[in-house]
Protein backbone atom coordinates (compact mmCIF):
# COMPACT_ATOMS: atom_id res chain seq x y z
CA UNK A 1 0.00 0.00 0.00
CA UNK A 2 2.85 2.46 0.66
CA UNK A 3 3.84 2.12 -3.01
CA UNK A 4 0.31 2.79 -4.28
CA UNK A 5 1.00 6.39 -5.31
CA UNK A 6 4.41 5.56 -6.79
CA UNK A 7 3.44 2.96 -9.40
CA UNK A 8 2.88 5.57 -12.11
CA UNK A 9 4.26 9.05 -12.64
CA UNK A 10 1.84 11.94 -13.10
CA UNK A 11 2.26 11.55 -16.88
CA UNK A 12 1.22 7.85 -16.68
CA UNK A 13 4.78 6.58 -17.20
CA UNK A 14 5.56 3.37 -15.30
CA UNK A 15 7.94 4.12 -12.43
CA UNK A 16 10.57 1.76 -11.04
CA UNK A 17 8.31 0.71 -8.17
CA UNK A 18 5.77 -0.58 -10.72
CA UNK A 19 8.25 -3.16 -11.96
CA UNK A 20 9.31 -4.06 -8.42
CA UNK A 21 5.72 -4.80 -7.43
CA UNK A 22 5.16 -6.67 -10.69
CA UNK A 23 8.19 -8.88 -10.03
CA UNK A 24 6.97 -9.67 -6.52
CA UNK A 25 3.66 -10.92 -7.96
CA UNK A 26 5.14 -13.42 -10.43
CA UNK A 27 3.72 -16.95 -10.07
CA UNK A 28 7.09 -18.40 -9.04
CA UNK A 29 9.35 -15.93 -7.29
CA UNK A 30 12.44 -15.83 -5.10
CA UNK A 31 12.72 -13.00 -2.57
CA UNK A 32 15.72 -11.74 -0.63
CA UNK A 33 14.40 -11.19 2.89
CA UNK A 34 16.08 -8.03 4.15
CA UNK A 35 15.25 -8.76 7.78
CA UNK A 36 16.87 -12.21 7.80
CA UNK A 37 19.40 -12.05 4.97
CA UNK A 38 17.97 -15.24 3.50
CA UNK A 39 16.01 -16.26 0.40
CA UNK A 40 12.29 -17.07 0.40
CA UNK A 41 10.60 -18.98 -2.42
CA UNK A 42 6.88 -18.68 -3.11
CA UNK A 43 4.36 -20.20 -5.49
CA UNK A 44 1.52 -17.77 -6.17
CA UNK A 45 0.06 -19.86 -8.98
CA UNK A 46 -3.06 -21.98 -8.69
CA UNK A 47 -1.30 -25.32 -9.21
CA UNK A 48 1.56 -27.31 -7.74
CA UNK A 49 4.96 -26.39 -9.20
CA UNK A 50 7.62 -29.10 -9.16
CA UNK A 51 11.31 -29.17 -10.03
CA UNK A 52 11.96 -25.67 -8.66
CA UNK A 53 15.44 -24.51 -7.61
CA UNK A 54 17.00 -21.13 -6.84
CA UNK A 55 20.54 -19.95 -7.51
CA UNK A 56 21.89 -16.91 -5.68
CA UNK A 57 24.92 -14.97 -6.87
CA UNK A 58 26.61 -12.16 -4.94
CA UNK A 59 28.77 -9.56 -6.71
CA UNK A 60 30.70 -6.56 -5.47
CA UNK A 61 30.52 -3.20 -7.26
CA UNK A 62 33.65 -4.11 -9.27
CA UNK A 63 31.82 -7.08 -10.76
CA UNK A 64 33.64 -9.80 -8.83
CA UNK A 65 31.56 -12.89 -8.06
CA UNK A 66 31.83 -13.33 -4.29
CA UNK A 67 29.33 -16.11 -3.62
CA UNK A 68 27.34 -18.62 -5.69
CA UNK A 69 24.84 -20.98 -4.07
CA UNK A 70 22.19 -23.40 -5.31
CA UNK A 71 19.18 -24.55 -3.33
CA UNK A 72 17.66 -27.98 -3.01
CA UNK A 73 14.88 -28.92 -5.44
CA UNK A 74 11.36 -28.06 -4.28
CA UNK A 75 7.80 -29.02 -5.14
CA UNK A 76 5.47 -26.26 -3.98
CA UNK A 77 1.72 -26.56 -3.72
CA UNK A 78 -0.41 -23.54 -4.64
CA UNK A 79 0.28 -20.51 -2.38
CA UNK A 80 3.14 -22.35 -0.68
CA UNK A 81 5.96 -20.25 0.83
CA UNK A 82 9.33 -21.69 1.89
CA UNK A 83 11.65 -19.51 3.96
CA UNK A 84 15.39 -19.65 4.41
CA UNK A 85 16.28 -21.81 1.42
CA UNK A 86 19.58 -19.94 0.91
CA UNK A 87 21.71 -17.45 2.85
CA UNK A 88 23.72 -15.37 0.36
CA UNK A 89 27.04 -14.17 1.78
CA UNK A 90 26.87 -10.40 1.27
CA UNK A 91 29.65 -8.02 2.25
CA UNK A 92 29.70 -6.66 5.79
CA UNK A 93 32.54 -4.13 5.46
CA UNK A 94 31.34 -0.61 6.26
CA UNK A 95 30.42 1.27 3.08
CA UNK A 96 30.27 -1.84 0.89
CA UNK A 97 27.33 -2.56 -1.41
CA UNK A 98 26.61 -6.07 -2.69
CA UNK A 99 24.49 -7.08 -5.66
CA UNK A 100 22.38 -10.20 -5.11
CA UNK A 101 21.07 -11.91 -8.24
CA UNK A 102 18.38 -14.55 -7.69
CA UNK A 103 17.60 -17.00 -10.49
CA UNK A 104 14.51 -19.17 -10.04
CA UNK A 105 14.59 -22.25 -12.25
CA UNK A 106 12.06 -24.93 -13.07
CA UNK A 107 13.45 -28.13 -14.52
CA UNK A 108 16.66 -26.22 -15.21
CA UNK A 109 15.09 -23.33 -17.16
CA UNK A 110 15.11 -19.80 -15.68
CA UNK A 111 11.53 -18.67 -14.99
CA UNK A 112 12.24 -15.70 -12.71
CA UNK A 113 15.15 -13.32 -12.19
CA UNK A 114 15.50 -10.69 -9.50
CA UNK A 115 18.36 -8.36 -8.52
CA UNK A 116 18.90 -6.54 -5.22
CA UNK A 117 21.59 -4.08 -4.14
CA UNK A 118 22.32 -4.60 -0.46
CA UNK A 119 24.29 -2.07 1.62
CA UNK A 120 26.42 -3.23 4.54
CA UNK A 121 24.94 -0.27 6.43
CA UNK A 122 21.14 -0.64 6.16
CA UNK A 123 18.24 1.70 6.81
CA UNK A 124 17.20 1.95 10.45
CA UNK A 125 13.58 2.79 11.19
CA UNK A 126 12.62 4.97 14.13
CA UNK A 127 10.99 2.53 16.52
CA UNK A 128 8.47 5.09 17.74
CA UNK A 129 6.88 5.15 14.27
CA UNK A 130 6.32 1.37 14.01
CA UNK A 131 2.72 0.71 13.08
CA UNK A 132 2.11 4.30 12.01
CA UNK A 133 0.81 5.20 8.52
CA UNK A 134 4.05 7.05 7.76
CA UNK A 135 7.16 5.51 9.31
CA UNK A 136 10.29 7.63 9.63
CA UNK A 137 13.97 6.75 9.65
CA UNK A 138 16.55 7.24 12.36
CA UNK A 139 19.37 6.62 9.85
CA UNK A 140 19.65 5.83 6.17
CA UNK A 141 21.43 3.07 4.26
CA UNK A 142 24.87 3.85 2.85
CA UNK A 143 24.67 3.31 -0.92
CA UNK A 144 27.45 5.73 -1.84
CA UNK A 145 29.48 2.90 -3.40
CA UNK A 146 27.03 2.91 -6.31
CA UNK A 147 28.32 6.37 -7.26
CA UNK A 148 31.71 4.79 -7.99
CA UNK A 149 30.45 2.05 -10.32
CA UNK A 150 32.79 1.74 -13.34
CA UNK A 151 31.33 3.28 -16.49
CA UNK A 152 29.97 0.83 -19.04
CA UNK A 153 29.92 1.89 -22.69
CA UNK A 154 29.35 -1.67 -23.95
CA UNK A 155 25.57 -1.87 -23.60
CA UNK A 156 23.80 -2.54 -26.90
CA UNK A 157 20.15 -2.74 -27.86
CA UNK A 158 17.99 -3.87 -30.74
CA UNK A 159 14.32 -2.99 -31.26
CA UNK A 160 11.74 -4.51 -33.59
CA UNK A 161 8.14 -3.35 -34.08
CA UNK A 162 5.22 -5.63 -34.95
CA UNK A 163 1.50 -5.11 -35.41
CA UNK A 164 -0.51 -6.72 -32.64
CA UNK A 165 -3.67 -5.82 -30.76
CA UNK A 166 -2.98 -5.08 -27.11
CA UNK A 167 -4.47 -3.45 -24.02
CA UNK A 168 -6.01 0.04 -23.94
CA UNK A 169 -6.48 0.16 -27.71
CA UNK A 170 -2.83 -0.40 -28.57
CA UNK A 171 -2.02 -1.78 -32.01
CA UNK A 172 1.78 -2.03 -31.98
CA UNK A 173 4.36 -3.92 -29.95
CA UNK A 174 8.07 -3.15 -29.79
CA UNK A 175 10.44 -5.92 -28.70
CA UNK A 176 13.70 -4.67 -27.21
CA UNK A 177 16.74 -6.81 -26.43
CA UNK A 178 19.40 -5.25 -24.20
CA UNK A 179 22.83 -6.87 -23.90
CA UNK A 180 25.87 -6.18 -21.73
CA UNK A 181 28.80 -6.79 -24.09
CA UNK A 182 31.52 -5.67 -21.69
CA UNK A 183 34.79 -7.59 -21.86
CA UNK A 184 35.52 -6.58 -18.27
CA UNK A 185 33.45 -7.38 -15.18
CA UNK A 186 31.45 -4.15 -15.38
CA UNK A 187 27.77 -4.38 -14.52
CA UNK A 188 25.10 -2.42 -16.38
CA UNK A 189 23.06 -1.03 -13.51
CA UNK A 190 19.40 0.02 -13.58
CA UNK A 191 19.06 0.04 -17.37
CA UNK A 192 15.83 1.61 -18.58
CA UNK A 193 14.24 1.49 -22.02
CA UNK A 194 11.83 4.22 -23.16
CA UNK A 195 9.83 4.53 -26.36
CA UNK A 196 10.16 7.91 -28.07
CA UNK A 197 9.10 9.85 -31.14
CA UNK A 198 12.06 10.10 -33.46
CA UNK A 199 13.41 10.12 -37.00
CA UNK A 200 14.21 7.34 -39.45
CA UNK A 201 17.90 7.83 -38.66
CA UNK A 202 17.36 7.14 -34.97
CA UNK A 203 17.40 10.69 -33.62
CA UNK A 204 14.92 11.75 -30.95
CA UNK A 205 12.59 14.61 -31.80
CA UNK A 206 13.07 17.77 -29.78
CA UNK A 207 10.90 18.45 -26.76
CA UNK A 208 8.64 16.02 -24.92
CA UNK A 209 9.10 12.97 -27.14
CA UNK A 210 8.41 10.02 -24.82
CA UNK A 211 5.35 7.82 -25.36
CA UNK A 212 4.39 7.60 -21.72
CA UNK A 213 1.21 5.76 -22.67
CA UNK A 214 3.24 2.72 -23.74
CA UNK A 215 2.97 -0.29 -21.41
CA UNK A 216 6.22 -2.14 -20.69
CA UNK A 217 6.50 -5.80 -19.70
CA UNK A 218 9.54 -5.04 -17.51
CA UNK A 219 12.19 -2.34 -17.12
CA UNK A 220 14.95 -0.89 -14.93
CA UNK A 221 17.04 -4.06 -15.31
CA UNK A 222 20.58 -4.90 -14.19
CA UNK A 223 22.87 -7.04 -16.34
CA UNK A 224 26.33 -8.52 -15.92
CA UNK A 225 28.71 -9.13 -18.87
CA UNK A 226 27.30 -11.70 -21.27
CA UNK A 227 23.75 -11.31 -19.98
CA UNK A 228 20.85 -9.99 -22.03
CA UNK A 229 17.16 -9.48 -21.48
CA UNK A 230 14.17 -8.94 -23.75
CA UNK A 231 11.46 -6.40 -22.92
CA UNK A 232 8.27 -5.56 -24.78
CA UNK A 233 6.09 -2.47 -24.89
CA UNK A 234 2.65 -2.05 -26.43
CA UNK A 235 1.45 1.29 -27.73
CA UNK A 236 -0.96 3.02 -30.09
CA UNK A 237 0.60 4.04 -33.40
CA UNK A 238 -1.50 7.22 -33.30
CA UNK A 239 0.56 8.39 -30.32
CA UNK A 240 3.62 8.60 -32.56
CA UNK A 241 1.96 11.53 -34.34
CA UNK A 242 3.62 10.50 -37.60
CA UNK A 243 7.09 10.10 -36.11
CA UNK A 244 9.35 7.04 -36.24
CA UNK A 245 9.46 4.86 -33.11
CA UNK A 246 12.85 5.15 -31.43
CA UNK A 247 13.88 3.32 -28.26
CA UNK A 248 16.32 4.94 -25.85
CA UNK A 249 18.28 2.91 -23.32
CA UNK A 250 19.93 4.67 -20.41
CA UNK A 251 21.35 3.56 -17.10
CA UNK A 252 23.12 4.52 -13.90
CA UNK A 253 26.59 3.91 -15.34
CA UNK A 254 26.11 3.94 -19.12
CA UNK A 255 25.72 6.66 -21.75
CA UNK A 256 22.29 6.92 -23.31
CA UNK A 257 21.84 5.18 -26.67
CA UNK A 258 19.01 5.35 -29.24
CA UNK A 259 17.94 2.68 -31.73
CA UNK A 260 15.21 2.73 -34.38
CA UNK A 261 12.38 0.30 -33.64
CA UNK A 262 12.18 -0.97 -37.22
Where are these regions (language model features)?
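Carbohydrate-binding surfaces of carbohydrate-active enzymes
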Residues: 1-219, 223-233, 242, 246
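Eukaryote-biased activation of long, low-complexity terminal tails and linkers
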Residues: 253-260
